[in-house]
Amino acid sequence: MSTNITIPVPAVPFAPPVYTCHRAKKPFELDGNINKPFWEDAPYTDEFLDIEGSHMPLPRFVTRAKMLWDDENLYVAAVLDGDEIWGHQTERDSVIFLDNDFEIFVDPDSDTYHYYEFEMNVLNTVWDLFLSEPYRDGGSGLNGYDMHGLRTAVHVDGSINDPSAENKCWSVEVVIPFAALYEYQKERRAPKNGEF
């Protein structure tokens, strides 16, 4: 007897850039500042582009990220350049993208379904949600979802909500426990070397 199985396929061409995430080798201290030994072994990503793609104008300011991992966590850091550093959302799970924000999308099985979305602003306000399917396929986020064990920090080189200040950038550090991502992993474990 044969059984037909439907496997989700992305509705748009899908060829994201590749980043090799190295294993962390040094002790970590969460403070939002990425100018420290922990991040020295992590290369920067390419500069971020508009979410709509490379056909859009280049961003006015540079944003780049770094990532590392160990047996328990995925570590993400980013530097967001800018001469005005704005943030107003202060309530968890508010619509953070109304402010300048940093966003992370994690899809443990790489099928573009059952993935986690994370956003944070310069005030260290977090919005984390789960999506069973992408927005483009009619999905909507589960706003009440909270990523257990998530830790975040922000460092500001300048002043928040003061355009007259000498603002340079803000940086973020995000610690995502692998255990928080197990629900939709085929194997409920942290990645092994070569998988991440």
Explain the meaning of each model-derived region.
Residues 1-196:
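Structural preference for beta-rich elements and adjacent junctions enriched in aromatics
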